[in-house]
Amino acid sequence: MNSKFLLLPTALMVAGHSAAEAKGKKSDQRPNILVILADDLGYSDLGCYGSEIHTPNLDKLAKQGVRFNHFYNTSRSCPTRASLLTGLYQHQAGIGRMTFDDHLPGYRGTLSRNAVTIAEVLKESGYATSMVGKWHVAETPLRKDQREWLAHHVFHDTFSDLCHYPVNRGFDSHYGIIYGVVDYFDPFSLVEGEVPVKEVPEGYYITQALSDRAAKEVEEYAKEDKPFFMYLAYTAPHWPLQALPEDIKKYEDTYKVGWEAIRNARYERQKQLGIFPGMDNFLSERQFHDKWEDNPHAEWDARAMAVHAAMIDRVDQGIGQIIEALEKTGQLDNTLILFLSDNGCSNEDCQNMSGRENDRPDMTRDGKKIIYPRNKQ
């Protein structure tokens, strides 16, 4: 049997062959299902979509399966997650905007109890169900201590009503975050099931931690006599831009040529890859007309792009770990793999987006100068 992979852009589906024989065939031969969701991944951020970023594992899946060129999404962010989990339009699922209660039908900020999740359906039909990663479909009102935790760890008992946690919406287990944005080295709202994780070990990086957990669970599922459904939702490459030094080093010179050169090179590769067949026209003008050579923060921006690339690189490395675990345990040939992003790349922190200096060195989003200690207390 062929395994099936789907990369959705961002989207993709693939067929490959496992080198390992199934170790102890299960009596229930329905396919395992692995859904992998990236966060704010751009259309051209993968090698198989023209990127200079090193993504060999996802590129291999794309080559073996189906790569989508016209995969559209009617929502974004947490509304995407609500739709993906329920098969409903985001308003029907209860999250028409974000995870804040606007006190309007369709805008309650929490996954509706009337919306059945795919995990609930598959669990009822005999699947083992697991979630690893970012939830972001439960109302998480910001309290002062939570805001402080984004910069400095302050323990808080719960991050939304427990009835809305993944383990109470069809998942047998969940390791990951409830909230939508975290410090990658000290993540806010990290839980194991319903229990907050108070401390993380030295050298912790959430992207790697999620990959490690997913690979471990894949190996454990090989011992069970039923298929599994795993929803792996990475936080990367959503801001804040935080990556491991060894990954950043790979790209420290890549983006010094500037965004125009990178954009044009990606487009040329996309044409060569057949993503835009028969199109010889030039790219449309960029939304912002500032030229790289006139950019006073070129060094800063080149570094930021390098960190962004490093975050994606680490996601791909993790997916390689998971594929290896599937192959080693003889499960790859009977696993459906889907990879997609909740939306395209984020433009929230671009210079001049709102007529002010956004995300510049030592500046706030409204252009005010800030001074703060570089080390977390």
State the predicted function of each range.
Residues M1, S18-K23:
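Short, low-complexity interaction segments enriched in Ser/Thr/Pro/Gly
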Residues M1-L7:
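Bacterial N-terminal signal peptides that target proteins for export
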Residues T10-A19:
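Hydrophobic h-region of N-terminal signal peptides that target proteins for export
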Residues A22-Q377:
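Formylglycine-dependent sulfatase
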